[in-house]
Swiss-Prot record:
Function recorded in the entry: Catalyzes the synthesis of the hydroxymethylpyrimidine phosphate (HMP-P) moiety of thiamine from aminoimidazole ribotide (AIR) in a radical S-adenosyl-L-methionine (SAM)-dependent reaction.
UniProt name for this protein: Phosphomethylpyrimidine synthase
Reaction catalyzed: 5-amino-1-(5-phospho-beta-D-ribosyl)imidazole + S-adenosyl-L-methionine = 4-amino-2-methyl-5-(phosphooxymethyl)pyrimidine + CO + 5'-deoxyadenosine + formate + L-methionine + 3 H(+)
Top-rank EC class of the record's enzyme: lyase
Binding site for substrate: N231, M260, Y289, H325, S345, R346, G347, D386, G387, L388, R389, E425, Y452
Family that this chain belongs to: Belongs to the ThiC family.
Upper lineage: Bacteria, Pseudomonadati, Pseudomonadota, Gammaproteobacteria, Pseudomonadales
Amino acid sequence: MSATQKNNITRLEQLDRQSTQPFPNSRKVYLTGSRPDIRVPVREISLADTPTAFGGEKNPPVFVYDTSGPYTDPEVRIDLRKGLPDVRSRWIDERGDTEILPGLTSEFGQARLADASLDALRFAHVRTPRRAKPGANVSQMHYAKKGIITPEMEYIAIRENMKLQEARAAGLLDQQHPGHSFGANTPKEITPEFVREEVARGRAIIPANINHTELEPMIIGRNFLVKINGNIGNSALGSSIEEEVEKLTWGIRWGADTVMDLSTGKHIHETREWILRNSPVPIGTVPIYQALEKVNGVAEDLTWEIFRDTLIEQAEQGVDYFTIHAGVLLRYVPLTAKRVTGIVSRGGSIMAKWCLAHHQENFLYTHFEEICEIMKAYDVSFSLGDGLRPGSVADANDAAQFGELETLGELTKIAWKHDVQVMIEGPGHVPMQLIKENMDKQLECCDEAPFYTLGPLTTDIAPGYDHITSGIGAAMIGWFGCAMLCYVTPKEHLGLPNKDDVKTGIITYKIAAHAADLAKGHPGAQIRDNALSKARFEFRWEDQFNLGLDPDTARAFHDETLPKDSAKVAHFCSMCGPKFCSMKITQEVRDYAKENGLSDESKAIEAGFQEQAARFKDEGSVIYRQV
């Protein structure tokens, strides 16, 4: 074994230990479906009893959506060198419409496998890929249109509900504000049949490549919980395979529903294999990045044949969705000439350069139906890229952006003709007053295919804080109907994000997505808010920490000023102190009402006022007294 291999193995053993820590006072539980191999993970957060002073009652556990996969299950032994346990192979085999290939069929994949110099980097357990049988279509959309409810669809229905009926029965939803959904139509309970209908209609997608069998199925659509994506990937300037796998496991721990591998540096193929074999969430890529590496970064040298081989290479590895910039047409490129920031999408600029160099139409557009044939053979979903998205608020909603969007709508209908799943990528940089126009136009042009946006960033003045400038726009567009939000980290526009940046970006976007779910009135969205608010009022500090999106940070902030264990049961915090805590005062009012037989707080307050007025008169009505 080489020194490099030994070093890699040591790093991955350390990563194993980092990635398997359960959240405090939480445990992984599995909800079983109609068959024993449908085991849907959720995180159960146990809560303390309400103190006797506040009425003394049991508080039921709260179940939350869990993207962390087996990593937070202490019953599962994680070995990143072997990959995650299989989830879906039996379901795929039962359908009888796929075949195991004799080996990798892409030229590039075969060449990498034959290169002995890569042995130290390679994932040791490379799986033999499968593909649809000749003439077959294995997409979830194809099954949905045929009226088939797949195990993946049942799994998703259970996952989206998260024991909602039990929560209602326990009173966790006695308070939930009605939402304003802008035309979305989420039922009170998500059923497998509803999942099937939404996928068949094209309003939702299930990104689930038949070669990514470690995947825990999830859904992206405006009538479901708003999802978030986290980006990882190396560059020519740095990062290793180990660092990218670490970012993956860290990102899904904090709530990334999907992850995009945007690697542009060395060993893209090998890095992606490690990521896929250790990912319980869908993995997306931008294939044109790797295709460009194959021609040494010269966009003009790209060909359809190289791109096609790249699609097959990545599909056989198990990539679940491809960003493909097929809407960057030759006639749209001049429309960007007067922009402040021109073309800011890497994929968009690559294709624009190719179109201008050859004075030909984008080969991704002219070969689109051939791409569909590849996609449906592996069930890879389209993420139709917005290569002409605005890179500044000055360029928002211009002719180039909306021209491309109209073309993406045309391509969506072509993909649906092939029963290939589609979502649409969106901007970008958009001031708040223009965000709804983006959502409305996308729904109109793309016939309600799921929208997936990068933010949008609502202002350009805050480098280093673009997770905030974009989180504002993300919450808004999520409310208006966007199905998935691509996170932005504090390093946006500045550098490659590290592990801490990944966490910050994800937490910011979990807040935005949840705020959107609340605003839409998604059933069950308010359960966690209600539970945390009750814990806050009852001074159950540990429950407050544990119900939050980031228990570690909440606990650390509290402990900065009140580190002693006694502070965890105190009826105040360091913000107001013991004498000015509004919640403590409110409880005292309630106690006064109870002691004096008063039916509500307003009567208690009025009685208190009258009592103090009488005392003032009894003491001589003197404003100032000697003390």
